[in-house]
Amino acid sequence: MSTNSQKIKILVAEDETIIRLDLVEMLTDAGYEVVAQAENGAIAIEMAKKYQPDLAILDVKMPEVDGITAAEQIISISPVLMLTAFSQRELVERARDAGVMAYVVKPFSIGDLVPAIEIAISRHRQMKTLETEVADLYERLETRKIIDRAKGILMKAMNLSEPESFNWIQKTAM
């Protein structure tokens, strides 16, 4: 389990009650905190919004809303790990396209889940960090474009050199 002092919070969505209860017990015994359980994708989406888990573990085949369709919405809240008996290429591709971070095929053991859980959460955090960095760089680039346009206007209007117009902008901004 993660070395963080806080337990990783997990949402479990599985329509088969016995499998869901076994999974919850396995996760709890491994040191994870199961904050919500759902028997279908629609409830999983509601629970994800309500509890904001660190990870959602979803079965693919569930009533009402299937796991992959639910994952498409949950992915904006937390990373998703698919846990399913189905390994058909079409399902794996749908899960990949939905943004799922891991895909574990049943039967499974906790030894199969822990690495998938830890890697999914780690990759999700890395992606969020990169998204923040990209947004920051984009903002800085846009600011730079505005400054360059302002320099051009000053150079023309006040007959200044580029360094002089930049200095004028710096002094005026302070």
Residue ranges and their predicted role:
Residues 90, 108-117:
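C-terminal output helix
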